[in-house]
Design a protein with these regions (language model features):
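Solvent-exposed edge beta-strands and adjacent loop segments
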Residues: 1-74, 178-198
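Beta-strand-rich interaction surfaces with strong enrichment in secreted/lumenal proteins
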Residues: 36-37, 100, 160-162
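Surface-exposed coil/turn segments at beta-strand junctions on protein surfaces, enriched
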Residues: 40-42, 105, 154, 165, ...
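Extracellular structured ligand-interaction cores
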Residues: 44-46, 134, 156
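Secondary-structure transition/turn motif
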Residues: 52-53, 114-117, 160-168, 206-207
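Extended beta-strand solenoid/passenger and fiber regions
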Residues: 62-149, 174-208
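A surface-exposed beta-strand-loop module
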Residues: 143-168
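Generic detector of short, aliphatic-rich beta-strand segments that form the cores of beta-sheets
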Residues: 168-174
């Protein structure tokens, strides 16, 4: 199996559904109180593609499904509801979130992240599949220049500085994809009428 660094055609996702999934274990006690334990440290997204608007959409999904060999290969998917590190309705900025990494004058590698914060609760999501050309990075809120000051591994989300930061706060932002695979080996297309085809194609996030 392999991960194919290609984005699922976003033009045929407008009829899709899906979003994040968590795994929680709940035990109900005798008095009706609950004991809740989170099983996963990280969310796992699930999606479903269900409708195609044009003949080209149908050709595209058939070609893509065969190329991925069903569930075998992974690929990128744009989640239209959550694909930017800041607000989903504004362009990413170099100061969206503090990156994960040690600032000590030695370490040069920092992980792109998105932080979801409500009150004192925060979930830090590692961004492993940033979109090429969208990454912006800053030191103490001063925007730096890709290649001149740092490089980005767009297959892992790791930002590598040419010179290790010493005391600065490292921040960054980007657009990103979700690493996924098809969650079926069967492409079950329904011919409801002439040139009208629907389907239920499950897609699930994979850990990379």
């Amino acid at each position: 199996m392999a991960f194919i660094e290609t984005q699922f055609p976003s033009s045929i996702q407008y009829s899709s559904s899906g979003g994040p999934q968590w795994r929680t274990e709940i035990v109900e006690l005798n008095g009706g109180q609950e004991q809740r334990n989170t099983i996963w440290d990280d969310t796992r997204h699930r999606y479903n593609i269900s409708e195609f608007k044009t003949d080209n959409d149908i050709d595209t999904i058939i070609r893509f499904f065969h190329a991925m060999q069903g569930q075998y290969h992974g690929f990128r998917l744009k989640d239209w509801a959550d694909y930017r590190t800041g607000s989903n309705y504004a362009a990413p900025s170099a100061t969206d979130h503090i990156l994960v990494g040690t600032v000590d004058g030695v370490n040069t590698d920092f992980q792109l992240v998105k932080r979801y914060t409500v009150s004192t609760n925060e979930y830090v999501r590692y961004i492993k599949k940033p979109v090429n050309g969208t990454v912006l990075v800053s030191l103490d809120d001063v925007t730096k220049t890709e290649t001149t000051d740092y490089t980005v591994d767009y297959t892992t989300g790791i930002v590598t500085f040419n010179t290790a930061p010493t005391v600065e706060v490292v921040k960054g932002g980007c657009e990103f994809d979700v690493p996924v695979r098809f969650d079926t080996d069967t492409l079950d297309l329904h011919h409801s009428s002439y040139q009208a085809i629907t389907a239920s194609i499950p897609i699930v996030e994979i850990r990379v």
